[in-house]
């Protein structure tokens, strides 16, 4: 792990030695100039997909942190600064690294960037592994049913996360990815912004109910194939 400061910019990298141009790794135009941009996705902002297998061992996704909701129309990307460890990018990087090292299927974090601004504010970016050849469940389920075993796999994955006392505060069908290849199915969890460790057990049931509501919402919105039998299978995997 390497932490570097350059003027008002702070960097955290998942490698041990300085690399050429590392302070530019969080600038999309740096990658565009090298013809390494291989795609993008729109959300609150643009997530850029980068061909970086030769540099980091994985292709990557570059994301700038933006605010949502009404407040985001006034202040799109500035956050109050208290400490580096509590910034959005450093916190998500460190959590992903902890989960990745524990063997959970999450994106490998590659780098985090914080730009300190006037009046004790900051902007932030995250560079992490792009999980390729996958779909999120809302893209798959309108046309495909999951088996009971696959729903149980999802339940087991969430249980592994909860057993580490990690609460995914935005656990929903969009943040579960699936890859099906050669009769093998694997699931990933993504988007750990504002997530973290939480003591006790009461919150775990609430977290599961959040996911349940997400599936029910997508039944109406995206017409996904989901039933209470599927949910029972997921819970069976979680409990066993």
UniProtKB/Swiss-Prot annotation:
An example Gene Ontology molecular-function term: phosphotransferase activity, alcohol group as acceptor
Protein's pathway: Bacterial outer membrane biogenesis; LPS core biosynthesis
Organism encoding this protein: Mannheimia succiniciproducens (strain KCTC 0769BP / MBEL55E)
Protein name as it appears in the record: 3-deoxy-D-manno-octulosonic acid kinase
SUPFAM superfamilies in the cross-refs: Protein kinase-like (PK-like)
EC annotation from Swiss-Prot or TrEMBL: 2.7.1.166
Primary location class: membrane
Topological category with respect to the lipid bilayer: Peripheral membrane protein
The protein's role, per its UniProt record: Catalyzes the ATP-dependent phosphorylation of the 3-deoxy-D-manno-octulosonic acid (Kdo) residue in Kdo-lipid IV(A) at the 4-OH position.
Subcellular localization: Cell inner membrane
Similarity annotation: Belongs to the protein kinase superfamily. KdkA/RfaP family.
One CC-aspect GO term: plasma membrane
GO biological process: lipopolysaccharide core region biosynthetic process
Active site annotation, chain numbering: 170
Catalytic activity annotation: an alpha-Kdo-(2->6)-lipid IVA + ATP = a 4-O-phospho-alpha-Kdo-(2->6)-lipid IVA + ADP + H(+)
InterPro entries given in the database record: KDO_kinase, Kinase-like_dom_sf
Pfam family, one: Kdo
UniProt keywords, alphabetically: ATP-binding, Cell inner membrane, Cell membrane, Kinase, Lipopolysaccharide biosynthesis, Membrane, Nucleotide-binding, Transferase
């Amino acid at each position: 792990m390497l932490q570097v400061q350059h003027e008002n910019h702070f960097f955290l990298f998942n490698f041990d030695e300085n690399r050429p141009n590392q302070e530019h790794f969080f600038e999309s135009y740096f990658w565009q100039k090298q013809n390494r941009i291989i795609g993008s996705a729109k959300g609150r902002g643009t997530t850029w997909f980068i061909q970086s297998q030769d540099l980091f061992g994985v292709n990557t996704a570059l994301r700038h942190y933006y605010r949502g909701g009404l407040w985001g129309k006034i202040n799109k990307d500035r956050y109050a600064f208290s400490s580096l460890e509590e910034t959005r990018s450093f916190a998500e990087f460190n959590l992903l690294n902890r989960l990745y090292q524990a063997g959970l299927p999450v994106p490998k974090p590659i780098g985090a960037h914080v730009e300190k601004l006037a009046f004790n504010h900051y902007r932030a970016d995250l560079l992490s592994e792009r999980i390729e050849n996958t779909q999120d469940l809302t893209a798959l389920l309108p046309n495909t049913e999951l088996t009971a075993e696959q729903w149980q796999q999802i339940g087991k994955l969430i249980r592994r996360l909860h057993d580490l006392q990690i609460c995914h505060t935005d656990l929903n069908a969009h943040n579960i990815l699936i890859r099906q290849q050669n009769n093998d199915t694997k699931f990933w969890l993504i988007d750990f912004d504002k997530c973290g460790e939480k003591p006790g057990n009461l919150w775990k049931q609430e977290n599961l109910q959040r996911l349940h509501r997400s599936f029910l919402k997508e039944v109406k919105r995206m017409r996904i194939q989901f039933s209470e039998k599927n949910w029972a299978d997921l819970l069976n995997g979680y409990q066993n």
